[in-house]
Amino acid sequence: MIFASETGFGRGAPPSRPRGRTRLLPNRNVAAPADGRVRYAHGMEPTDATAPQIQDSQDGRRAVQRRGTVRVVTVAYNPGEELVRFLESLGRASRRRVRVVIADNGSEHEIVREAAERFGAEVVTDGTNRGYGAGANLAARDLGEDWIVVANPDIVWRPDSLDVLIDAGLNTAGAGCLGPRLLNPDGSVYPSGRALPTLVRGAGHAALTRVWPSNPFSAAYHSQGGNDAVREVGWLSGACLALPAPVWRELGGFDEGYFMFFEDVDLGARVARAGWRNVQVPAAIVVHEQGASWKARPERMIRAHHASARRYLDGVYSAPWQAPLRWAVDGGLRLREELEVRASAPRPPRRGRRK
């Protein structure tokens, strides 16, 4: 779950949007990665041959465009030291004016307050835990900045990564939601830009991904290909998202009907339906540490994930004549849910052989 509006985003009216399908419009002046090279997917190439070069400043950091203001919101629920790493690395991720708001969804210790005081962040809470999307919406209330960035508290920002992400948004026509390249702690790339799930694609992915990870259904769902290219995708992982404030307001933020999981899929679908583009920017890099707050309760998370999946697909296949399809999807997801819960249950220790 906020930068300059000199290119049409921000306090003025949003740029005109195409009706129906989102048009593929070119990028201009997207900030380059450290090696100075930017790669573009087909249809996303810059048209301005005089795009500015990235230059080193006196302190050795790359000079980037400094336009607008940003609100970074994050949702915390019993976080560990990853929240400190999140806030500490955020200070190196941007030279813009950044306001940080933490939604505390009911932490049982003082680390949220202590970290906020140390790094100058704000903490908001309504005293309940209504889920990730509701927490992000609470932290985004009365949004007065130009851009909003929603990010998990368990990510570590690479230097300048937030500026690179926002610069791409400022220079990509019709960009309504942008996401960085997510790295796992071991350095491997997490597939954070994906195609919207459909029944066939989702069923194939669910059935085959464990036994055949490279199957075509999973490859299509993960939208693999052009990993180094700025490209348009169906939706972006909610671990880190940047939206122009007018787009966030138009969409009303996250759908709070999703307690956890799929709120980012739903947001991506609504971004596209409104005529905006979901854009992945691999030159902006963050590391997703995947904190342990949910791993201690795998059954609860598995059930929340499947409940959200059913809710999303019920909306996609909502026509009366599709009722049998919804029933079949619901039954399949409930079966998969029980199998995953059973597999996640701790196994009793093996007894040694009797001598």
What are the language-model segments listed below?
Residues 158-191:
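Conserved donor NDP-sugar-binding/catalytic core segment of glycosyltransferases
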Residues 226-252, 256-285:
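A short, conserved alpha-helix in the catalytic core of glycosyltransferases
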Residues 197-233:
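Short, flexible, basic/aromatic active-site loop/helix in glycosyltransferases
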Residues 88-97:
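Short, acidic, metal-binding catalytic loop of nucleotide-sugar glycosyltransferases
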Residues 148:
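Short aromatic/hydrophobic "clamp" motif used to bind/position activated sugar donors
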Residues 125-143:
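Glycine-rich, basic loop-to-helix element that forms the pyrophosphate-binding segment
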Residues 9, 269-347:
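Active-site-adjacent helix/loop segment of glycosyltransferases
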Residues 89, 102-112, 128:
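A conserved acidic beta->alpha catalytic loop
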